[in-house]
Swiss-Prot record:
<dbReference type="GO" id="GO:0005509">
    <property type="term" value="F:calcium ion binding"/>
</dbReference>
<dbReference type="InterPro" id="IPR016090">
    <property type="entry name" value="PLipase_A2_dom"/>
</dbReference>
<feature type="binding site">
    <location>
        <position position="29"/>
    </location>
    <ligand>
        <name>Ca(2+)</name>
    </ligand>
</feature>
<dbReference type="GO" id="GO:0016042">
    <property type="term" value="P:lipid catabolic process"/>
</dbReference>
<keyword id="KW-0443">Lipid metabolism</keyword>
<keyword id="KW-0959">Myotoxin</keyword>
<dbReference type="GO" id="GO:0005576">
    <property type="term" value="C:extracellular region"/>
</dbReference>
<keyword id="KW-0528">Neurotoxin</keyword>
<dbReference type="GO" id="GO:0050482">
    <property type="term" value="P:arachidonate secretion"/>
</dbReference>
<dbReference type="InterPro" id="IPR001211">
    <property type="entry name" value="PLipase_A2"/>
</dbReference>
<keyword id="KW-0044">Antibiotic</keyword>
<protein>
    <recommendedName>
        <fullName>Basic phospholipase A2 BnpTX-1</fullName>
        <ecNumber>3.1.1.4</ecNumber>
    </recommendedName>
</protein>
<comment type="similarity">
    <text>Belongs to the phospholipase A2 family. Group II subfamily. D49 sub-subfamily.</text>
</comment>
<keyword id="KW-0378">Hydrolase</keyword>
<keyword id="KW-0479">Metal-binding</keyword>
<dbReference type="GO" id="GO:0042130">
    <property type="term" value="P:negative regulation of T cell proliferation"/>
</dbReference>
<feature type="binding site">
    <location>
        <position position="27"/>
    </location>
    <ligand>
        <name>Ca(2+)</name>
    </ligand>
</feature>
Amino acid sequence: DLWQFGKMILKVAGKLPFPYYGAYGCYCGWGGRGKPKDPTDRCCFVHDCC
């Protein structure tokens, strides 16, 4: 779920997930479309697919 995904981002990246990644790239945040712009955005894309 989104809560667990946020906890994982905090642990791995050491940053609060929503201020830093809430509107990042094409897939981090609400919705998503297009091609992921980098590995971080790809991780959000994969999360959206599950």
